[in-house]
Structure formats: C-alpha cells, structure tokens
Amino acid sequence: VPVSGKFTDRQRDVYNAVLRVMRGAMTLLRPGISLQAYHVQVGALMTKELIDLGLITAEEVANENPAWPAYKKHFMHGTSHFIGLDVHDVGHWHKPIEAGHVFTVEPGIYIREENLGIRLENDILITEDGFIDLMGHIPLEADEIEAMMAG
C-alpha cells in the first residue's frame, strides 16, 4: 500500500507486475505438480515481468547461472510455502502437490536502487480441479487500493 495513498507511475507498474506474477502463480499450483517444478515456472513469469520493467535484459537471462537465475537480483525469495500447523509448515519439495494442501503465493519485486519493494501474499487451498482463494475478498487492484486509502 503506498504510504501517500496513491501509487506513482513506477510503483503502479511494479505493483501490477507483481500482481500478474501472483495471479499466474496461483493457476500453476494444482494437484500433481511439485514445488520444484512450480518454482521454475514462476521464475519464468517473473523473468518476463522484470524484462518488461527494464530491470533485467534478455541477454542477462541467456547468460544466467542456472543456480542463480537473473530474476533473483530482484526476487530473491521463494514464491510459496506450505501452511498448516505452523506458518511455514513442512512439505516435500519433490513430491506432487495434493488436493487439500494450503499454500502461500507471495511474489515480490525489490529494486534497491529505487528504494522500492512490492510483495503480495495470498493463501490458497488446492482442490481437485484448481484452488480456492482464501483471501479473495481482499482488494488487490491498484485502483481499489487507492480508493480504499482515500477513505
């Protein structure tokens, strides 16, 4: 949420990029996929957004170290973790996700040079045919947030 109650153009662009990654990531979490495969796919979503924002280049991606992809410069943490008896519950990195599992989806973009960081977090329940957004009632669009901040 912007402290001033209104996004600058740059804040809005970065916020919307994070929101697109979050929404894309939510559709990827489904029964049968492993967290490892999921994180690779989310990395691809984030890479596209960071290129579009001018934060990394296609050349950097082509020459990246697979152990530390180019997107890690601005998105250095994981995208999701299990939620259960504990906030960061235990789960298996290589085992397929199952219906009934609950996960966070929490992408972020951090631009140290601009003193700008945006992270969104959502919680979802995996179902047999998709997911239930456990935080679907919370406004996420930039315009909705600005309207809420205006009171």
Please tell me what each predicted stretch does.
Residues 1-151:
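Active-site neighborhoods and metal-handling regions in enzymes and metal-associated proteins
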